């Protein structure tokens, strides 16, 4: 890449440079504080997903980058495919090139899916469908209910497919035209508390997808899934019942989806009363999952949703402050 273009590696380190630059261009102190500091970091050692990705966006902005491509620590430029004899093997892909090709077609944002073990590990119990409906993940119901056959492994079937318009954006497989930041919303995912324990909502990339669905930006699926080592020990099959790490991952995925759902129900103009049936399904599915895993944490998912709903006013405040600060930064930076 360096032989063909100017390449910069954006690393998340200290924010001293960003603080100085924002101060120089006239961003208010309150906005700088909102963009660079999060109370969860010092108090609990947690960084909200959206906050982290915005740090990378700002560093790329201040570096003068034209295109930013996210490379998460748990992905590799490979895809899983089946051989003619049915075995699964990894195949190297031109991940960076695929994103740059999509951006060269005029896209503001390029994205695609993942290859590897899904966040839903292999399982088989009554209540799987209820749980996913309660978590607004019903599109995954057939996949999960058949997971004992495919072991939760996502394999790429199509080759050389052409990029297609999409509204689905995944932060770990993402390219951005930096000039689009004038119309692109910031990444955002709120946090909330349950029994004094902080929980991070997922869906930090959902606002970008919503902007694409409203035609504010052009987003392409580059048809290039990237290998995601979900549990950090591929090719070991995830064992939900006997591996506490797998249960932890699923538990925090559930609490993350709950936080996302509560916030985006509000963002899309819905009220909690519209989801009474889903709440019943969440309670039934959570009870079934707790029995299946012998892990009582899952029993509390309905209580955790109630806690998230009580935190909605605070989530809205987090969002409005983040959006206001981000808009001020981009207006100052691109209006120089």
Could you say what each language-model-derived stretch is?
Residues 2-63:
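Active-site-proximal specificity loops/subdomain of glycosyltransferases
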Residues 5-23, 99, 121-125, 138-157, ...:
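Extended charged low-complexity segments that act as oligomerization/scaffolding linkers
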Residues 65, 104-108, 217:
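Short, high-confidence coil segments that cap the C-terminus of an alpha-helix
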Residues 65-82:
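Short beta-strand-to-loop acidic/aromatic patch adjacent to the donor-nucleotide binding site
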Residues 78-189:
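Conserved catalytic core of nucleotide-sugar-dependent glycosyltransferases
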Residues 202, 218-241:
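Active-site donor/metal-binding and catalytic loop motifs
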Residues 230, 239-336:
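Terminal low-complexity segments of carbohydrate-biosynthetic enzymes
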């Amino acid at each position: 890449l360096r032989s063909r273009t100017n390449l910069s590696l954006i690393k998340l380190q200290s924010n001293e440079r960003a603080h100085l630059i924002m101060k120089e261009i006239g961003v208010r102190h309150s906005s700088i504080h909102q963009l660079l500091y999060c109370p969860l970091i010092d108090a609990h050692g947690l960084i909200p997903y959206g906050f982290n990705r915005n740090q990378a966006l700002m560093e790329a902005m201040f570096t003068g980058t034209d295109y930013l491509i996210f490379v998460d620590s748990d992905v590799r430029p490979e895809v899983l495919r089946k051989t003619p004899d049915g075995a699964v093997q990894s195949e190297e892909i031109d991940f960076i090139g695929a994103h740059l090709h999509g951006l060269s077609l005029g896209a503001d944002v390029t994205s695609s899916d993942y290859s590897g073990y899904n966040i839903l590990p292999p399982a088989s119990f009554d209540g799987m469908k209820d749980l996913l409906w309660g978590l607004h993940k019903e599109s995954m119901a057939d996949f999960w209910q058949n997971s004992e056959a495919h072991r939760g492994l996502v394999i790429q079937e199509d080759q050389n497919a052409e990029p297609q318009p999409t509204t689905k954006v995944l932060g770990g497989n993402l390219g951005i035209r930096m000039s689009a930041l004038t119309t692109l919303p910031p990444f955002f995912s709120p946090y909330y508390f349950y029994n004094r324990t902080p929980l991070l909502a997922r869906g930090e990339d959902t606002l970008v997808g919503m902007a694409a669905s409203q035609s504010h930006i052009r987003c392409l699926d580059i048809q290039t899934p990237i290998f995601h080592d979900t549990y950090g020990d591929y090719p070991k099959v995830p064992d939900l019942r006997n591996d506490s790490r797998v249960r932890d991952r699923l538990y925090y995925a559930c609490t993350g989806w709950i936080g996302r759902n509560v916030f985006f129900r509000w963002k899309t103009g819905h009220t909690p009363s519209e989801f009474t049936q889903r709440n019943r399904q969440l309670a039934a599915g959570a009870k079934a999952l707790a029995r299946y895993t012998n892990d009582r944490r899952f029993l509390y998912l309905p209580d955790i949703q109630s806690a998230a709903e009580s935190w909605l006013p605070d989530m809205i405040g987090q969002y409005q402050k983040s959006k206001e600060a981000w808009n001020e930064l981009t207006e100052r930076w691109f209006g120089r």
